[in-house]
Amino acid sequence: GFLNQFQFVRSAGSYTATGLDFLINKKFNRISSWLTYSYADNTYAFNDLVPSAFPNNLDIRHSIAFASSFTHERFEASAGLKWHTGKPFTKPVETDPITGNTINYEAPNSSRLEDYMRVDLSVKYNFPLSTRINAQIGASVWNLLDNNNIIDQYYRINDSNEVQVFQQKALGI
């Protein structure tokens, strides 16, 4: 749903998504790597809303992912990187944020969150416990650089009749 001026509006619409995906995958002996790039343009269309067309809530224009893994006998290590442009959101009008009891928003999805970036690492060791039982032990670190990735942002009016910002963040270390 919407977290802006259309939050409580019931309307039927559609969306169009166009884009390109590229994948490069290469294996070198014990190392396997891949790299992807995606470009996407996702746009909503609602005949009875103004404006009638605006970016989709998940309109992430550019996305890059890279991963590589190394295997040697019973040992495996992997690393990955994920980056993408920020998704759209709607800010209140800076000069006049509240009209009556409602937030006065800018055009829908006209702002973008900061870019998202994450680096992950993992290691795993496989070993036999007996002739019939195999075991694995491993560890992984998600968001190794502990980036402060904001994945959503919305607004509410607090008890003091001020606009309050809420941010949803991805996991850190």
Provide a role label for each language-model segment.
Residues 2-92:
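Gram-negative outer-membrane beta-barrel transporters
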Residues 2-9, 46-51, 101-109, 157-162:
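Extracytoplasmic loops and strand-loop junctions of Gram-negative outer membrane beta-barrel proteins
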Residues 14-18, 60-64, 115-119, 133, ...:
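Residues that define the transmembrane beta-barrel architecture of outer-membrane proteins
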Residues 16, 36, 115, 138-141:
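A subset of signal/propeptide-processing and intrinsically disordered low-complexity segments
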Residues 26, 59, 70, 112-114, ...:
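Surface-exposed coil/turn segments at beta-strand junctions on protein surfaces, enriched
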Residues 63-69, 103-106, 128:
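Generic detector of contiguous secondary-structure segments
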Residues 83-99, 117-118, 124-173:
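C-terminal beta-signal and adjacent terminal beta-strands/loops
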Residues 106-113, 124:
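Short, glycine/charged-rich beta-strand-loop motifs at protein surfaces that mediate ligand recognition
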